[in-house]
Curated annotation (Swiss-Prot):
Recorded family membership: Belongs to the ATPase B chain family.
Organism expressing this protein natively: Brucella ovis (strain ATCC 25840 / 63/290 / NCTC 10512)
Statement: the UniProt record of this protein carries the keyword Transmembrane helix: yes
Molecular function GO terms recorded: proton-transporting ATP synthase activity, rotational mechanism; proton-transporting ATPase activity, rotational mechanism
Keyword Transferase: no
Function statement: F(1)F(0) ATP synthase produces ATP from ADP in the presence of a proton or sodium gradient. F-type ATPases consist of two structural domains, F(1) containing the extramembraneous catalytic core and F(0) containing the membrane proton channel, linked together by a central stalk and a peripheral stalk. During catalysis, ATP synthesis in the catalytic domain of F(1) is coupled via a rotary mechanism of the central stalk subunits to proton translocation.
Transmembrane segments: 1-21
Location (main, coarse): membrane
HAMAP family per UniProt: ATP_synth_b_bprime (MF_01398)
Gene Ontology CC entries for this record: plasma membrane; proton-transporting ATP synthase complex
Summary of subunit composition and partner proteins: F-type ATPases have 2 components, F(1) - the catalytic core - and F(0) - the membrane proton channel. F(1) has five subunits: alpha(3), beta(3), gamma(1), delta(1), epsilon(1). F(0) has three main subunits: a(1), b(2) and c(10-14). The alpha and beta chains form an alternating ring which encloses part of the gamma chain. F(1) is attached to F(0) by a central stalk formed by the gamma and epsilon chains, while a peripheral stalk is formed by the delta and b chains.
Compartments where found: Cell inner membrane
Pfam family, one: ATP-synt_B
Protein name: ATP synthase subunit b 2
Amino acid sequence: MDATFWAFIALVIFVAIVVYMKVPGMIGRTLDERADRIKKELEEARTLREEAQQLLAEYHRKCKEAEKEAGDIVASAEREAKALLEEAKRATEEYVARRNKLAEQKIATAETDAINAVRASAVDLAVAAAGSILAEKVDAKAAGNLFNDALAQVKSHLN
C-alpha cells in the first residue's frame, strides 16, 4: 500500500464525511438562497426603475401641462389687456366727444345770449332815441294821437 492508495482512502473518507454532514445540500441551499435574494433584488430594481420611469413620464406631462397653462394665462392676460386698452380708448373718446359737445353747447348759448344782449341794447337804444326825437318834435296833441293809434294797433293784434 503505497502513498497514493492512502491518499485515495483519505479522499474517500473526506468525501464521505462531507456527504454525511450534508455539506453539498448546505452549499446548494446557500447558493439557492443567494440566487433567490439576487432575483428579489433584480425584481425590486426593475420595479424601482419602472416607478422612476412613471414618475419621469408624469413629471414631463405635468411640465407640459404647466407650460400650456402658462401659455394660456399669458394669452388670456394679453386679451384682457387689449380689451382694457380698447375700453379705455373708447371711454376716452366718449369723454372727449361729450366735453366737445358740452363746449359747443356753451358756445352756442353764449352766442345766443350775446345776440340777445345786442338786440336788447339796440332796442333800448332805439326806444331811447325815438323817445328823445318824439319829445323834441311832437307836441301834446300829436302825442295823444300817436298813443291812440298805437293802442288801436295793439288791440287789433291781440284780437
